[in-house]
Amino acid sequence: MVSNLENACLSSHYVYCPGRVCLFGEHSDWAGGMRRFNPDIPVGRTIVCGTNVGIHARARTLPTMLTVQSTDETGGKYGPFSVPMEPAALLAKAQEGTFFSYAAGVAYHMLTHYRVGGLEIDNFETDLPLKKGLSSSAAFCVLVARAFDRVYNLRLTVRGEMECAFAGERLTPSKCGRMDQACANGNRPVVMTYDADFLAVEPISISEPLYLVLVDLRAEKSTVRILNALQGCYPVATTAEHRNVQHALGIGNLDITSRALAAMEAGDAQQLGAIMDESHALFTAAGSAVCPEELLAPVLQRVLTHPLIRPLVWGGKGVGAGGDGTAQFVCKSLAAQQELVRLVESELKMHPIPLTIEPSTTVRSAVVPVAGFASSLFPATKVVSPPLFPICDRDGVAKPAILIVVEELCAAGFDKIVLVLILTYKETYKETYRPKRDR
């Protein structure tokens, strides 16, 4: 007969990570990182927001293996793939360059930095388009890091998940920058600044909803070819074409992101759309000179200038690395967003993804009274305070009720949480929230 404790250990944890859309500043993340070799290069800056589509998975412990089964956006199944949870085996698998390599790279990092065992990940649903500039690979890396965190109760912060995911991805042949791990922040817009190895992440407060539509162009592009061409212009520019690329990703990008940030905070969608058009023109002019086969992007250009689309939008640009992957538009209204979705499906036979960036909440602090006694729970309350009653969470782990409440508040974006309690239970609450490393 299986005990309750064994059931809890065998239970799976639901894990989710969205994709991300870079509104402005593509490629400036790795370009800013080049300051390690050339301090004359300007810092990089991106404006990023999570998507409302992503990767869904269940995760549970395994003794000695990493096993992953994945599902793409069409419902196609891949795997399961398995590798021993050993450093040499994980590193070799990470360097192969397959989609499974991302999981192996992150697992290698987790194994060498934390006390973890094996893991089984069942990616049972994916509604995030793959290889379309929405950071599907980075989302998968964050998902794996998050799965280790949930299953082994590592208590990583969002920033910690991002760092683990990036470290794991860098063990693969991928040349993506740090921006992609912004998908760990959920659908909250953030501005990210890159100065060599330093990364700053700040949330953006907007006053009015912004109605966007992402369009999967259902065409082909090579991110590897684009990155090879653009990164060939660094760290020192040797030709006029190289200098134009460094300007577009440097000084030009800082100017565009500064004005875009101001427009977002003011809720000025019209100005934001105009800046998108300007940003697209700047990047295309510089990028297509060094990678014309990818960055001239005829499908993208046709969609951005489509006569049925332009009356509905304030502006638009490419997404991610660029090329014929995904387009994004700032719509004039909610009705325009809905009409654009219909038009893209019926007329262009492409896949639209509506994305609404809501105004930031003004409530950032929560006060939770935990000093009361529930008479209906007597005499159990003689032993433990009601907020400390054990409740089985959806991940199958029994936790104090107040811990579940605080986790939900943290997930909702509250910066400060105050518990009002009886002094008798002060030490109990301090022990509940004391970091594991201090125990």
Model features per residue range: what roles?
Residues 1-46, 54-101, 109-115, 168-170, ...:
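C-terminal nucleotide
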Residues 21, 63, 72-74, 123-130, ...:
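Acidic, glycine-rich active-site loops and adjacent beta-strand->loop/helix elements
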Residues 360-432:
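N-terminal glycine-rich phosphate-binding loop and ensuing alpha1 helix
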Residues 134-154:
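DPxDG-like acidic metal-binding loop motif
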Residues 69, 118-124, 156-168, 274-275:
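Beta-strand segments within the central parallel beta-sheet cores of soluble alpha/beta enzyme folds
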Residues 86, 107-108, 113-132:
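Glycine- and acidic-rich phosphate- and metal-coordinating loops
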Residues 108-112, 146-150, 262, 407:
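Short glycine/serine- and small hydrophobic-enriched flexible loop segments
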Residues 339-344, 430-438:
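Short, aromatic/basic amphipathic alpha-helical patches
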